[in-house]
């Protein structure tokens, strides 16, 4: 996605070999037009996958997931990173390790928003080691539903996540694939 590549190069900051800061358009301030375009790309790639719902993990995946769901005319479900009292314990949960924050959290899904006939598209902002996407897939499959695909805004291709998910049979589609990060340098996969 050329417009995303351009924004990453113009506004993104490689803070280290593993950390890319894109808070000016994706995960602090959000550019709605760019999110809409992302939704179009995800819709076009996954439109023949017979998807019934779009899932994401709070919070930075919400904007691209909403735009994708809107364009596919489907509901969007947010997987919670902490348990909520209003969920009343009728949930699926799995432990996920956050690469960015270096901590574990309980990914939570209310049982009333999934059934065994669902074919789910998971949308997330970043893919590094694949723990978040794999955790989402575990919840979906625990409910008896299927993972139709995994859409990623920015994939860190130099980390193991994308290959690990593909090796497990998931259809992973990334809008931007980063080959290398170093202080001040961002290189895309050719």
From Swiss-Prot:
Keywords in alphabetical order: Cytoplasm, Glycosyltransferase, Purine salvage, Transferase
PANTHER family (UniProt xref) = HYPOXANTHINE/GUANINE PHOSPHORIBOSYLTRANSFERASE (PTHR43864), XANTHINE PHOSPHORIBOSYLTRANSFERASE (PTHR43864:SF1)
What is this protein's record name?
Xanthine phosphoribosyltransferase
State its Enzyme Commission number(s).
2.4.2.22
Q: Mind telling me which GO cellular component terms the entry cites? A: cytoplasm
Q: Which of this chain's residues are annotated to bind xanthine?
A: 20, 27, 156
Function recorded in the entry? Converts the preformed base xanthine, a product of nucleic acid breakdown, to xanthosine 5'-monophosphate (XMP), so it can be reused for RNA or DNA synthesis.
Show the InterPro entries listed in the entry. Answer: PRibTrfase_dom, PRTase-like, Pur/Pyrimidine_PRTase, Xanthine_PRibTrfase
Location in the cell: Cytoplasm
SUPFAM superfamilies with a match to the protein in the record: PRTase-like (SSF53271)
Q: Where are the transmembrane segments?
A: none
Record-annotated residues binding 5-phospho-alpha-D-ribose 1-diphosphate? 128-132
Q: Which NCBIfam families match?
A: PRK09219.1 (NF006671), XPRTase (TIGR01744)
One GO biological process term is:
xanthine metabolic process
Q: Which domain of life is it from?
A: Bacteria
Top EC class for this record: transferase
What family is it from? Belongs to the purine/pyrimidine phosphoribosyltransferase family. Xpt subfamily.
Major localization class:
cytoplasm
Single GO term (MF): xanthine phosphoribosyltransferase activity
- How would you summarize the oligomeric state and partners of this protein? Homodimer.
Which organism's genome codes for this protein?
A: Clostridium beijerinckii (strain ATCC 51743 / NCIMB 8052) (Clostridium acetobutylicum)
Q: Which Pfam families match?
A: Pribosyltran
């Amino acid at each position: 996605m050329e417009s995303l590549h351009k924004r990453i190069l113009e506004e993104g900051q490689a803070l280290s070999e593993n950390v890319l800061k894109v808070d000016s358009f994706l995960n602090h301030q959000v550019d709605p037009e760019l999110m809409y375009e992302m939704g179009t790309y995800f819709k076009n790639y996954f439109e023949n996958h017979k998807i019934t719902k779009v899932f994401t993990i709070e919070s930075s995946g919400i904007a691209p997931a909403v735009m994708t769901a809107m364009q596919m005319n489907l509901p969007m479900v947010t997987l919670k990173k902490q348990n909520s009292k209003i969920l009343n314990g009728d949930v699926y949960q799995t432990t996920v390790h956050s690469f960015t924050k270096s901590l574990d959290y309980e990914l939570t899904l209310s049982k009333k928003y999934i059934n065994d006939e669902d074919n789910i598209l998971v949308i997330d902002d970043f893919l590094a080691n694949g723990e978040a996407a794999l955790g989402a897939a575990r919840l979906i499959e625990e409910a008896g539903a299927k993972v139709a695909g995994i859409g990623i805004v920015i994939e860190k291709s130099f980390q193991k996540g994308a290959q690990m998910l593909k090796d497990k049979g998931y259809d992973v589609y990334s809008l931007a694939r980063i080959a290398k990060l170093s202080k001040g340098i961002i290189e895309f996969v050719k």
